[in-house]
Swiss-Prot record:
Residues 1-18 have a biased composition (Basic and acidic residues). Binds directly to 16S ribosomal RNA. The lineage of its organism: Bacteria, Bacillati, Actinomycetota, Actinomycetes, Mycobacteriales. GO terms for molecular function: small ribosomal subunit rRNA binding; structural constituent of ribosome. GO terms for cellular component: cytosol; small ribosomal subunit. Residues 1-25 are annotated as: Disordered. InterPro entries: Ribosomal_bS20, Ribosomal_bS20_sf. Keywords: Ribonucleoprotein, Ribosomal protein, RNA-binding, rRNA-binding. This is Small ribosomal subunit protein bS20. One of its GO terms (biological process) is translation. It comes from the Bacteria. The keyword RNA-binding applies.
Length: 86
């Protein structure tokens, strides 16, 4: 347990940030899962719309510092490649 006041505050701050990041990552995974399901079904129109919204969510996660920009670029590239194979 922290003995210093600033450490106690950092613990509280870090916990809030952890929960916020967890929620962002969860919504990202949900969006990616939905896109992959649309690709698996062969629904090109729906998958195209979902790719745009998923890419936007990935970019926002990078801006918030939740994921690294290279990870987002890698995921966007892989998802676009999968969509283009339809």
């Amino acid at each position: 347990m922290a003995n210093i006041k600033s450490q106690e505050k950092r613990i509280r701050t870090n916990e809030r940030a952890r929960l916020r990041n967890q929620a962002t990552k969860s919504s990202l995974r949900t969006a990616i899962r939905g896109l992959r399901e649309a690709i698996a079904e062969g629904d090109k129109e729906k998958a195209g719309e979902l790719l745009v919204s998923t890419s936007r969510k990935l970019d926002k996660a990078v801006t918030k510092g939740v994921i690294h920009k290279n990870q987002a670029a890698n995921k966007k590239s892989a998802l676009a490649l999968a969509l283009n194979k339809l």
